[in-house]
């Protein structure tokens, strides 16, 4: 993203700008900017060496999260419950950082939310907030179920929307698509996990299309061409409860092991409420326990009159895919 922003800037083409690109791809710079602008977030500290990292971990406290400063896909992300955990994982985290830097952040308990915000001529337009449910264990950062609309309401929902918008403004995104990830505590306090300036993965573009009738790809293409974006392309056209169930190993429906056979999606797609599904598996591949975003090997999107019904349908349909493995 920083390279694309620099090229666009040099050629006088539409883009998000080099400063914003840096802020939205480098987690330490992002945290410092959010702190300066008063956006709520966890405690954090940067680290390049073991000595700096130990001080950072002790300053932030435990539990905490260790991440590369400039990577993604849950690569090099670890939960820390002690200084021994930090010592064990620092090398792996730094190895995933192109700049050789890591960040330690306070671990926030609560419900994680995925946000979608469209920035248009300096205005931040909130599109969706959805639950991002995560598996237990080492893959705790991987979203394995998305549920729209979010299961919070009232003040907590209003605060989550306010913080998402504030984060986008703080990072200087004037035109583009933003992906703020938030944590909402049991008391309704909202903190920012991070914010990306892109169409997110994890079928979030499909969520926007099926849930609110907005085509993020069209918006992004029009903005890249410098076109004006009319209201009907950026504001929700309807609100349809839905859920996305990713196909993963436990706690998902897939077995672990070397794939021997992958059944068809016919039964999955025929299940009531299912609007889209896909599988990313081939014979000979190995299904591993959930650790990275890439361990999601497919998905099912289902709708319903309520988000709970949509979730029940997505989970049930995902269980209909027949996969045989050699253990």
Residue ranges of predicted features:
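A short, glycine/Asx- and small/polar-enriched loop/turn
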Residues: 61, 184-191, 291-295
